[in-house]
Regions:
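Alpha-helix-loop-beta-strand connector modules within alpha/beta enzyme cores
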Residues: 54-78, 117-139, 160-164
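Active-site mouth loops of central-metabolism enzymes
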Residues: 11-28, 74-83, 110-116, 143-156
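Conserved, mostly hydrophobic/aromatic
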Residues: 16, 36, 89, 97, ...
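Conserved N-terminal beta1-alpha1 strand-loop-helix module at the mouth
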Residues: 2-49, 57-63, 67-73
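Catalytic cores of alpha/beta
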Residues: 82-93
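Glycine-rich, proline-tolerant flexible connector loops at the mouths of alpha/beta enzymes
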Residues: 42-67, 100-114, 143-150
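N-terminal small/glycine-rich loop or linker at the start of catalytic domains
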Residues: 1-21, 98-111, 132-149
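Short, well-ordered coil/turn segments that N-cap beta-strands
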Residues: 4-6, 40-42, 70-76, 94-95, ...
């Protein structure tokens, strides 16, 4: 794989909002994201289309996308854990879907209660939904530089996951 360009994604909205003990008002989230867009961020992970029961702080993902002042210079992305989330993301007119797994089996199991293979299998359905709706998919790999449970992750494992992403037609890793 020849890397031609590295793009940095601002994940503060999604990662930060989900970490708050209290649920922030949707209009406050929209305001923060609008300021990030205005500041020139080109790729922003605005939320996640996860079950509202799992992470109530992100239950308003679709409403955020309805109200953000979109800018052609900013790609609005969100984490999508499953096909149901992918369908919600399509309905919300998300610019880009992000899927993720952990390179280490133990971390992936603790994080999403799936093996790496099970996660990859689920991503195929998400990729199909995204493809039918012309939405690009980005594949993220957690614990790529080390796992708190297993230590170093072999480079071969990262290459295998990256190759699976490529075979599914993902736009990047």
């Amino acid at each position: 794989m020849n890397v031609k360009q590295v793009k940095v994604t601002e994940v503060g909205p999604r990662d930060g909002f989900q970490s708050e003990k209290t649920v922030l008002k949707t209009e406050d989230k929209v305001d923060i994201i609008n300021h990030l867009i205005k500041a020139g961020f080109q790729r922003i992970e605005v939320s996640s289309f996860v079950s509202p029961k799992a992470i109530p702080q992100l239950a308003d993902a679709a409403t955020i996308l309805e109200n953000v002042k979109r800018n052609s210079n900013a790609t609005l992305a969100a984490l999508v854990p499953n096909a149901k989330g992918a369908l919600r993301a399509v309905d919300a007119k998300l610019d880009e879907i992000v899927v993720f797994l952990s390179a280490s089996e133990s971390h992936n199991k603790k994080n999403v209660n799936r093996s790496v293979k099970e996660s990859l299998t689920g991503f195929k359905e998400i990729a199909d939904i995204a493809g039918k709706n012309n939405i690009p998919v980005q594949g993220d790999i957690a614990t790529a530089f080390g796992c708190p449970f297993e230590g170093n992750v072999p480079a071969k494992k990262l290459a295998e996951i990256s190759n699976e992403y490529k075979l599914m037609g993902f736009k990047g890793v």
